[in-house]
């Protein structure tokens, strides 16, 4: 952005190179504040290489500045990281592609000049809205292109007829035409349409410059001849980096997330990355990930996957070289020797950020890597991920700490008046329970658990997807079932029989199931926790040995819609039911990716409920912490009330009539029916959310 790069004059720019520079200038002036731009220039020019007046960054400078492990340049003394976390080449590849925006097909890979880096930061931090007003806030296609290898597809007939030796020869030929360190996947034509879903960002950029014709010229690459795929090795390296830095906050040190990881932490990060990769087909894992599959998986089941790149590249907007207490001149024109790169020291005592609050138990399921995995798709009221919305997770219930009693479950969970996450971990019946055989699944419950039937609340914004439930599987393969949007727009007539969550001491926990009318009628008109006369009669006769009448079976929850989860009353087994034939009915929409079996049976090893504490924007602005913990204080108040009520019940004296045993039993039965004393005072018949 100097005199040599000026595009001013009577003639408007007409070449891709000139238009690219002009777009960078607009990005710089409209997407950054003057202070941010000053810091950006200092960071770039103080580290840039100089070749005959041409200033640029190479891969080593980029990796060192961002504190990203790079196996090519990282010294052994900086070790303590897994080689598979060496994402430096992947990030450099992405940046070189994005720096050529919007002419990636003719100018990529670009040299990392200041103009190129401006476009990179704007695109990866999603600041382009001020310039590209018609640009859709969707970078999926652009990011796919930055990761994908482009090669000439093998025809189906040749793919089937030729032997493995000829295939290897073709692979070797194509590999020689690409950058070292990245494999090019040779694959059959997957009907990838180069022009499908036009790149809205690129079109908006060229429309703002009145240069659509130049853009069309740039697009004249035969989409029928060339196809693009992301190699699994490239995608795995990026996934491991994103999982490691998911908790990263703006201007927070990156090194505490990317270096000095223990072997257990490295294994945990790799495991989460592998579960995401396992969600693609075997053919894609072998030959490369297609755009259609990548776009659908990321957009629906991993909408926040690339969020960690925003705070990572925002480091370029703050320079430690600048001392704002005094004026500095010529900072942007200084030589590399005058401003050597400042190495960020690793603070051994500094711990990575965690959103898990201390409480009554430590999780046997959640690890930092698994929480990072959850942050890639779970919603938050702010529209951002779990980390960027400042959400905290409070331990509510654990079978390890509180036992497998539904009474204990009610005591801890039904008193939590905020959204929650249910996490179940186990293995298929008969398996040995090794880490590779573990199955981890769960549900996001946006409403507090309630002891009585209630319809869906629609007071929130109709576009607030954080108020939709989610059903998901984490291990061994990633798959998500988002909540049905109709839950926000209408009050479904079936809400009474298809609640999001149904709880019963008889049948257990049901999520997304249809509840038979007979089960609903037994508690419809008697209020929360108050058993109907029929229930009380059955309970009384069962305790008296009248099992013949009690054998009248109560029909349990019925799987309904695209997905349902049923947990038995002993919290010992769970069943995940998936349907790919259902329409728009049910609590959840179809699983994405569609790789789950129709029925999954697991023996439960651990079950945990984690409460979600969302920051109150009004209180947060004042700086207080009272409201953010209000759900915790409400739960404690409920426990104290229950304790007082239990003491009060102990003091109730039943004195009616002459005080005979018969009259005493009748009076006591009446109080039990009212839910005031006895087991029913603590064991409510059921409830739903």
From Swiss-Prot:
Keywords: Cytoplasm. Residues 543-556 have a biased composition (Polar residues). Coiled coil: none annotated. Residues 154-173 have a biased composition (Basic and acidic residues). Residues 364-613 form the TLDc domain. Residues 154-180, 328-347, 519-564 are annotated as: Disordered. SMART domains: TLDc. GO terms for cellular component: cytoplasm. It is found in: Cytoplasm. Its main location: cytoplasm. Belongs to the RTC5 family. May be involved in a process influencing telomere capping. This is Restriction of telomere capping protein 5. The gene is rtc5.
């Amino acid at each position: 952005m100097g005199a040599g790069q000026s595009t001013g004059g009577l003639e408007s720019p007409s070449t891709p190179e000139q238009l690219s520079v002009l777009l960078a200038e607009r990005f710089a002036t409209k997407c950054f504040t003057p202070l941010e731009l000053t810091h950006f220039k200092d960071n770039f020019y103080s580290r840039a290489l100089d070749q005959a007046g041409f200033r640029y960054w190479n891969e080593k400078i980029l990796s060192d500045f961002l504190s990203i492990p790079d196996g090519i340049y990282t010294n052994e003394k900086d070790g303590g990281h897994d080689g598979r976390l060496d994402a430096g080449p992947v990030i450099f590849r992405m940046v070189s592609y994005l720096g050529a925006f919007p002419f990636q097909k003719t100018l990529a890979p670009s040299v990392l000049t200041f103009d190129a880096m401006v476009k990179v930061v704007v695109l990866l931090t999603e600041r382009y809205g001020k310039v590209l007003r018609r640009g859709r806030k969707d970078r999926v296609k652009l990011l796919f292109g930055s990761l994908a290898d482009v090669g000439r597809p093998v025809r189906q007939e040749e793919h089937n007829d030729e032997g493995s030796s000829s295939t290897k020869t073709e692979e070797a030929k194509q590999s020689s035409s690409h950058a070292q360190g990245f494999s090019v996947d040779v694959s059959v034509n997957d009907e990838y349409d180069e022009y499908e879903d036009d790149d809205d960002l690129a079109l908006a950029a060229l429309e703002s410059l009145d240069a659509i014709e130049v853009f069309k010229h740039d697009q004249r690459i035969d989409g029928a001849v060339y196809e693009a795929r992301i190699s699994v090795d490239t995608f795995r390296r990026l996934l491991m980096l994103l999982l490691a830095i998911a908790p990263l906050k703006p201007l927070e040190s990156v090194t505490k997330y990317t270096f000095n990881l223990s072997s257990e932490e490295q294994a945990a990060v790799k495991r989460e990355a592998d579960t995401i990769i396992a969600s693609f087909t075997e053919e894609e894992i072998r030959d490369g990930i297609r755009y259609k599959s990548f776009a659908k998986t990321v957009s629906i089941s991993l909408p926040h996957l690339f969020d960690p790149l925003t705070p990572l590249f925002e480091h370029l907007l703050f320079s430690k070289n600048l001392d704002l207490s005094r004026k500095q001149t010529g900072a942007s024109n200084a030589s590399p020797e005058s401003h050597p790169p400042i190495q960020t020291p690793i603070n051994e005592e500094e711990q990575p950020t965690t959103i898990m609050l201390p409480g009554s138990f430590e999780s046997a399921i959640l690890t930092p890597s698994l929480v990072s995995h959850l942050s890639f798709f779970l919603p938050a009221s702010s529209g951002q991920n779990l980390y960027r919305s400042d959400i905290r997770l409070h331990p509510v219930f654990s079978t390890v700490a509180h036992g497998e009693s539904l009474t204990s479950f009610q005591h801890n969970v039904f008193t939590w008046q905020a959204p929650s996450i249910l996490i179940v971990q186990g293995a298929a019946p008969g398996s040995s329970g090794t880490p590779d055989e573990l199955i981890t699944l769960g549900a996001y419950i946006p409403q507090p658990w309630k002891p009585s039937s209630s319809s869906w609340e629609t007071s929130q914004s109709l576009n607030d997807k954080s108020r939709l439930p989610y059903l998901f599987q984490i291990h061994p393969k990633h798959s998500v079932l988002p909540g049905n949007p109709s839950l926000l727009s209408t009050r479904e007539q079936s809400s009474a029989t298809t609640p999001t969550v149904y709880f019963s001491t008889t049948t257990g926990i049901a999520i997304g199931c249809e509840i038979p009318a007979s089960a609903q009628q037994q508690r419809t008109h008697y209020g929360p926790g108050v058993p109907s006369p029929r229930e009380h009669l059955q309970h009384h006769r069962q305790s008296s040995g009248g099992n013949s009448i009690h054998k009248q079976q109560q029909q349990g929850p019925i799987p309904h819609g695209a997905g349902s989860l049923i947990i038995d009353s002993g919290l010992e087994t769970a069943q995940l039911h998936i349907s790919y034939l259902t329409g728009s009915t049910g609590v959840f929409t179809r699983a994405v990716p569609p790789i789950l079996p129709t029925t999954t049976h697991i023996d439960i090893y651990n079950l945990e409920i984690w409460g979600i504490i969302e920051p109150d924007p009004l209180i947060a602005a004042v700086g207080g912490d009272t409201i953010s913990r209000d759900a915790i204080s409400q739960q404690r108040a409920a426990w104290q009330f229950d304790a007082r009520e239990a003491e009060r019940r102990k003091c109730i004296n039943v004195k009616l009539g002459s005080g005979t045993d018969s009259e005493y039993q009748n009076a006591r039965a009446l109080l039990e029916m009212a839910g005031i004393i006895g087991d029913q005072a603590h064991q409510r018949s059921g409830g739903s959310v």
